[in-house]
């Protein structure tokens, strides 16, 4: 069995950041207050990730299905995204964090795709953490788009993995807020991910919670569909 440190080397962690609205409701606050608190949680978790051996952190910020939410809430989320890009890019670059946004950009409000491109260019040299934020993202749509690009002749498991996985398969997938579903997030990339569900709402999720999730991951025995050597010997 690998040591916890070895198993955390270059870890790709992904988080479904759920519970902002319920966090706000429990405090008698509007949903927007929960989303604003959620941005602060992003900052804390991204800062803590490298020390825990996480090389890539993918965060589910806005799904393609989230366009169905009330226009006022969607507008607030887009303003938060714009403010995050404007206010955090320089700090991310200084800290060695490379920012990448995945998902569709052609439906985002005017100016945001350009702000994303500027932030990605400004942080491109970052080698401490690869921070990926999923916006207007659907894993099923991403798989279909990749298959269309590859075409019948180019379609294979390896080619699809290369087209989708970018920094590699997800090792640890965390969902906050108590729900236990994947919600169309990284379905191909998380095929063998270890799942960690927590009741904690996203705005309350911090460095200690991330460390606990990584410790839980490190204690697991990942077999990727096979058997451990002792079991193979016993079965022979």
Q: How does the language model describe each region?
A:
Residues 1-236:
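Flexible, compositionally biased loop and terminal segments
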